């Protein structure tokens, strides 16, 4: 997919993302010797996890619409270099697990070259690949990797996976992996919907020590809830499942929420996370363009992505 959009000219102060982004294959990205601030978008082309989870399909096209929405955003800091992995990680012939492994390898490689990696789905099964990529890279840096997951989501995504992985099993898989390897499972979820998770899922989350906040309690949260997560971990996996937001803001999702949170309720928390000096990876999932109106869901998430990028690189817009 090509990046394109409005062109006001070519002076630095009127440039937009589509005018500066460099689309490269993985080998070219790994050969890049730029050591400054750099972002790499990685696309994950998958409906398979949602199909297995009996959800409504369409998220495989989410990343395309995100790129369209991101394309026209103005450049505020020319020191930030934008890159896009040319080919999406693609689920072929229903082989979800192979795609997750490929994604993990891509993420680990890009992180080894100090890219701020932004993964764009696709279904939320993207999270298993992203997390394992972060962990794989972290293991090359320390014998005691501390990876904290902060998820904005209406669901725990800790369903059984004895019949295979899907878009609702990732964090149970990660929990089991961590237990087996003796790694702390530090999973924190914001926006949980009381009626979108069974009692078993609540019980399972509690048994694994998951910290969660109901959507109805979002206004009670502050930096005080977020900063301890950032302080005790060296790597932060920030994952946003778009169905956390209210249906009027995010109609184009796999599982729309009539009592979802509002973007302005999340932005302060996201800013706190984005400003961390810890090693941050961002991931977004579950945009289903076929159910969207005027691309409002893609526009919302694109705005949040860019906000996180700019905040992470200390770019203030006056």
UniProtKB/Swiss-Prot annotation:
One of its GO terms (molecular function) is manganese ion binding. Binds 2 manganese ions per subunit. Its cofactor is Mn(2+). Mn(2+) 1 binds at residues 124, 153, 157, 241. Pfam families: Arginase. SUPFAM superfamilies: Arginase/deacetylase. Pathway: Amino-acid degradation; L-histidine degradation into L-glutamate; L-glutamate from N-formimidoyl-L-glutamate (hydrolase route): step 1/1. It catalyses: N-formimidoyl-L-glutamate + H2O = formamide + L-glutamate. The keyword Manganese applies. NCBIfam families: hutG. HAMAP family: Formimidoylglutam. This is Formimidoylglutamase. The lineage of its organism: Bacteria, Fusobacteriati, Fusobacteriota, Fusobacteriia, Fusobacteriales.
């Amino acid at each position: 997919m090509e990046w394109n959009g409005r062109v006001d000219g070519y002076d630095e102060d009127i440039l937009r993302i589509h005018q500066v982004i460099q689309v490269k294959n993985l080998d070219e990205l790994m050969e890049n010797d730029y050591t400054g601030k750099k972002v790499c978008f990685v696309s994950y082309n998958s409906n398979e996890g949602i199909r297995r989870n009996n959800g409504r399909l369409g998220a495989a096209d989410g990343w395309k619409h995100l790129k369209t929405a991101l394309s026209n955003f103005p450049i505020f800091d020319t020191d930030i270099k934008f890159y896009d992995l040319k080919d999406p990680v693609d689920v072929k012939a229903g082989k979800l697990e192979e795609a997750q492994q490929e994604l993990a390898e891509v993420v680990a490689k890009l992180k080894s070259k100090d890219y701020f990696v932004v993964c764009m789905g696709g279904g939320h099964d993207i999270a298993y690949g992203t997390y394992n990529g972060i962990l794989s890279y972290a293991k090359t840096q320390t014998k005691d990797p501390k990876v904290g997951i902060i998820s904005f989501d209406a669901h725990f995504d800790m369903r059984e996976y004895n019949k295979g992985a899907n878009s609702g099993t990732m964090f149970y898989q990660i929990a089991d992996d961590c237990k087996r390897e003796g790694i702390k499972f530090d999973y924190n979820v914001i926006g949980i919907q009381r009626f979108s998770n069974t009692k078993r899922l609540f019980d399972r989350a509690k048994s694994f020590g998951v910290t969660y906040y109901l959507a109805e309690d979002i206004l009670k949260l502050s930096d005080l809830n977020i900063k301890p997560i950032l302080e005790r971990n060296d790597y932060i996996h920030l994952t946003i499942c778009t169905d956390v937001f209210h249906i009027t803001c995010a109609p184009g999702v796999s599982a729309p929420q009539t009592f979802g949170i509002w973007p302005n309720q999340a932005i302060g928390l996201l800013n706190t996370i984005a400003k961390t000096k810890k090693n941050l990876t961002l991931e977004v999932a579950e945009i289903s363009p076929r159910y969207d109106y005027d691309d409002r869901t893609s526009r919302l998430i694109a705005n949040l992505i860019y906000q996180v990028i700019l905040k992470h690189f200390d770019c203030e817009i006056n």
